[in-house]
Amino acid sequence: MLLGSVPQLDRVAVQLGPFPVYWYGIIIGTGVLLGLWLATREGERLGIPKDTFVDLVLIAVPIAILFARMYYVIFEWEYYVQNPSQIINIRQGGLAIHGGLIGAVITGILFAKRRGVSFWKLADIAAPSILLGQAIGRWGNFMNQEAHGDEVTRQFLEGLHLPDFIINQMYIDGVYYHPTFLYESLWNFAGVILLLALRKVNLRRGELFFTYLIWYSIGRFFVEGLRTDSLMLGPLRIAQVMSIGLVVISIIFIIVRRKMGQADKRYSEN
């Protein structure tokens, strides 16, 4: 597709009759499947049957998407109260990761209790998978030309040595923008590598998941400061507030669980 003289990628991957299939959904789905593959491999190594994570994903993903959308709609209520028909339209984005995390954690706790397994063990195994899914999912924002930063020049983007297809996709309505999706995606990919390495350190149970929350939140805090489409509560960027909260809560949980003897088991213990 051409916008002016700048070639760009079409957000629609394929048209099935009257129904467009968007790259956003394909990319999100790919992230889920690769994350599931990573979790099932590690789960089997630690004695958790493959179908445990398959069942968890089948339940948690729809609920996480629902919570992600609800979270987004709540903080954009002025728009959606005037356009209620758009509340269920997620084909072009509008999913908030923090809302999805809330839904996923609630589902994971209830699922673990019902299956009689440790939630912290499931969370630790799933942590790299969740971050991998987030790293891949940001490319859905890229295809939708959303979640970008402030205005920049083409020369600035070329100075980052980015490939032309990224630079061109950051040209929106006659202006080039910061590719904040890319910054966060690269940060998340680096986090996946870190979490996979920390598996070998054999941390106390639950601490790999808290490390994920801390790592992701630090990156998200700084990237969010560059974005132009942040969900706001008065003068505050909600994602930055949530990021600070998650870092503080994670550190407190690590310290308190150790002092209370609730983190005696190690990552690889049954």
Swiss-Prot record:
It holds the Pfam family LGT. GO terms for molecular function: phosphatidylglycerol-prolipoprotein diacylglyceryl transferase activity. GO terms for biological process: lipoprotein biosynthetic process. The chain crosses the membrane at residues 19-39, 56-76, 92-112, 116-136, 178-198, 206-226, 236-256. Pathway: Protein modification; lipoprotein biosynthesis (diacylglyceryl transfer). One of its GO terms (cellular component) is plasma membrane. Its EC number is 2.5.1.145. InterPro entries: Lgt. It is a multi-pass membrane protein. It is found in: Cell membrane. Keywords: Cell membrane, Membrane, Transferase, Transmembrane, Transmembrane helix. Its main location: membrane. A 1,2-diacyl-sn-glycero-3-phospho-(1'-sn-glycerol) binds at residue 138. It comes from the Bacteria. HAMAP family: Lgt. Belongs to the Lgt family. PANTHER family: PHOSPHATIDYLGLYCEROL--PROLIPOPROTEIN DIACYLGLYCERYL TRANSFERASE (PTHR30589:SF0), PROLIPOPROTEIN DIACYLGLYCERYL TRANSFERASE (PTHR30589). Catalyzes the transfer of the diacylglyceryl group from phosphatidylglycerol to the sulfhydryl group of the N-terminal cysteine of a prolipoprotein, the first step in the formation of mature lipoproteins. This is Phosphatidylglycerol--prolipoprotein diacylglyceryl transferase.
